[in-house]
Amino acid sequence: MSEKIVAGNLDEVISKNAEIRDEMREKAVLIRTNLNRMQISSSNRLAMQILKPYGLIQMPIDNPFWSGAIFVKNGKKIPVINTALPRANQYFTAWHEIYHLIYDKVSFSHIIETETVMEERKAEYFASLMLLGNLLPYYTELSEMDFLSKIFHCMDAFAAPYKAVLIALYESAVCLLYTSPSPRDIS
């Protein structure tokens, strides 16, 4: 798990995301093209399809703070997802674990705190990109609603956790404020 994200460190998280944005966008596009031979349109179904060959274990675990992990047994990496959590959290966890399975070369070989924390930030940002894609246009087209209702609609439409939606919208707003292209414009 990466650092705990709160209002006080949100700008730092967005800054870290800016450092890894291009790399993560490239990885997201590679997944959508190279690992989606069956042209699955649902991001959630694609995640499950990618995890199955790794021996995905889905089981309810009575711990609201434990969403998933990768266990290594006899050299084989096996993803586990906590099904006791809401589906949105499960999908986010699935993409998070896919990042570790396919791209993370640090977390399984040795532990260096700063590298591991950055790999966790990359995994979370990657999961957010895979689930939320182009969130801002959807959000802005939800007219005549209060902020919280719009967030709930985004959570439902993208099957994404509350915190991921808030961070993505904040990041998009920061990008718009500084007139850089939105980090969420991937197809």
Question: What are the roles of these predicted feature ranges?
Answer:
Residues 1-180, 184-187:
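Active-site hotspot residues in diverse enzymes, especially metal/ion-binding acidic/histidine motifs
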